[in-house]
């Protein structure tokens, strides 16, 4: 029995930045591939704190609403253009007056995926992950895709593979599920990466490298076997290396169209924390990154 669809489909949070424009386009394409609705959301943050406190003019709220409507309208236009007239896509939009992070977390509980730009208009530098994106990848009730406006230029991007990091944790099993689904919908290869050392080999005296490598390769093959039976249309390549996971994933992402990681790995303490590998990949990869989460 297939699981029931969530009411919001793919949700894109927009704020008028270049990154959110890119997110609207990517989210629309993903929603069209899934044949589910796209919901464009802009949250007007009426609770703006200053020090010392200062009064805002009465027209402030009107200006915020007008700007919000323009942001939503532009994002909807970009989303429809990204999909094209020959593909069917149901697009809804919401303008919400509230606090951005709690609102988006609540919406995520009824979404198949949330898509956000890597940094918003308030970002100090494009190398930083925006505060809303950073919070959502820690707290959302569904997978979160983070999109850059300056994605790396990849030859023939539509045929580039999907990349997934696997470390044997339950969360990486969820990432594997998301990655197979995305690769199947795109009709591309899946590259499964297992980098099994968080330290340099020279720091591990007496290590039987060949034995560990062989065991790691066997473990990855076993992890993937069931998924390959479920998705026989997805060609799979396995990469098993003695390397730091984040470094290898970022390196391999240069030739991928999408990277999928778990929200935290074997060392993750709780669902509220973002693992060091996921955090590093989100900041360093220049292609879309999905952080696999669930409610």
UniProtKB/Swiss-Prot annotation:
GO biological process, one term: response to hypoxia
Keywords: Antibiotic resistance, ATP-binding, Nucleotide-binding
Binding site residues for ATP 1: 13, 117-123, 131-132
GO molecular function annotation: ATP binding
Chain sites annotated for binding ATP 2: 165, 198, 262-268, 276-278
Superkingdom of origin: Bacteria
Cellular component GO terms, alphabetical: peptidoglycan-based cell wall; plasma membrane
Signal peptide positions (record): none
Keyword Isomerase belongs to the record: no
Deletion phenotype: No visible phenotype under normal or hypoxic and normoxic stationary phase growth, nor in mouse- or human-derived macrophage cell lines.
Induction conditions: A member of the dormancy regulon. Induced in response to reduced oxygen tension (hypoxia) (at protein level), low levels of nitric oxide (NO) and carbon monoxide (CO). It is hoped that this regulon will give insight into the latent, or dormant phase of infection.
Stated role: Probably involved in aminoglycosides resistance and virulence. Overexpression increases resistance to the aminoglycosides amikacin (AK) and kanamycin (KM).
Identification of the protein by name: Universal stress protein Rv2005c
Species whose genome carries this gene: Mycobacterium tuberculosis (strain ATCC 25618 / H37Rv)
């Amino acid at each position: 029995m297939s699981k029931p669809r969530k009411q919001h489909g793919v949700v894109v949070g927009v704020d008028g930045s270049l990154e959110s424009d890119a997110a609207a386009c990517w989210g629309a394409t993903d929603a069209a591939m899934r044949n589910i609705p796209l919901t464009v959301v802009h949250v007007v943050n009426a609770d703006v704190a200053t020090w010392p406190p200062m009064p805002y003019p009465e027209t402030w709220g009107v200006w915020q609403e007008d700007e919000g409507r323009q942001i939503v309208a532009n994002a909807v236009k970009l989303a429809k253009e990204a999909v094209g007239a020959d593909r069917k896509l149901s697009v809804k939009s919401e303008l919400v007056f509230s606090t951005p992070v709690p609102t988006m977390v609540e919406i995520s509980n009824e979404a198949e995926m949330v898509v956000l730009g890597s940094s918003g208009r308030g970002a100090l530098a494009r190398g930083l992950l925006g505060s809303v994106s950073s919070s959502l990848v820690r707290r959302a009730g569904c997978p979160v895709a983070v999109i850059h406006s300056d994605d790396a230029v990849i030859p023939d991007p539509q045929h580039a593979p999907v990349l997934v990091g696997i470390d044997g944790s339950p969360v990486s099993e969820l990432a594997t599920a998301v990655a197979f689904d995305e690769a199947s919908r795109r009709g591309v290869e899946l590259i499964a990466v297992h980098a099994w050392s968080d330290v340099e080999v020279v720091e591990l005296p007496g290590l039987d490298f060949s034995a560990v490598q062989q065991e790691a390769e066997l473990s990855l093959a076993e992890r993937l076997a069931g998924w390959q039976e479920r998705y026989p249309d997805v060609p799979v390549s396995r990469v098993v290396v003695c390397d730091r996971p984040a470094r290898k994933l970022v390196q391999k992402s240069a030739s991928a169209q999408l990277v999928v990681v778990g929200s935290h790995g074997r060392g993750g303490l709780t669902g509220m924390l973002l693992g060091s590998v996921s955090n590093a990949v989100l900041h360093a990869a220049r292609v879309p990154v999905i952080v696999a989460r669930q409610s």
